[in-house]
């Protein structure tokens, strides 16, 4: 079931009031930004391959969509996507997730995190509320894969974490970002 435009605006206002708005303009996204990000990722590859903690969610961060999400792709289209970096941000946004799901039980919600601790907590608390996954690396192919798979109506990013490539891709697709 889709989420109405007025519901999205209400959620956007609530999140913006509580956490501040994230600008949708990402005009400075250039080849050099992506090149530098990819180079840093390449330099970090040995750490990512040999440290179990750093390896957590690596495939999801690269844009490889897990089967549990692929199998629900149609159902998740038009979802609300909440992003919380870690435990603190997740704890801040969780009451909003619960309240929204209570008011709109048929709405599809997804939650992404960046850290393993945030991921573990989100999976535990959102078991019956939302699909949980790792936020993609800010590279064109990773962002495209997740945005194609989910086709969200709105992305709510907690705190002020800003990813220029992700922001640009959302803006290009007309996805509301708060």
Task: Describe the residue ranges of each PLM region.
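Active-site and donor-binding regions of nucleotide-sugar-utilizing enzymes
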Residues: 45-178
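Short hydrophobic helices that act as membrane-entry/anchoring signals
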Residues: 23-48, 52, 60
């Amino acid at each position: 079931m889709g989420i109405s435009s007025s519901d999205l605006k209400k959620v956007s206002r609530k999140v913006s009031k509580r956490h501040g708005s994230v600008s949708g303009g990402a005009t400075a996204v250039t080849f050099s930004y992506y090149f530098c990000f990819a180079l840093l990722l390449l330099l970090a590859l040995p750490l990512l391959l040999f440290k179990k903690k750093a390896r957590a969610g690596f495939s999801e961060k690269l844009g490889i969509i897990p089967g549990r999400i692929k199998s629900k792709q149609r159902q998740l289209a038009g979802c609300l996507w909440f992003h919380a970096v870690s435990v603190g941000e997740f704890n801040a946004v969780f009451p909003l997730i619960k309240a929204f799901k209570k008011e709109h039980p048929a709405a599809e919600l997804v939650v992404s995190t960046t850290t393993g601790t945030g991921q573990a907590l989100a999976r535990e608390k959102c078991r019956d509320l939302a699909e949980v996954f790792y936020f993609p690396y800010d590279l064109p192919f990773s962002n495209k894969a997740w945005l194609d798979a989910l086709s969200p109506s709105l992305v709510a990013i907690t705190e002020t974490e800003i990813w220029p490539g992700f922001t640009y891709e959302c803006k290009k697709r007309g996805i509301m970002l708060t």
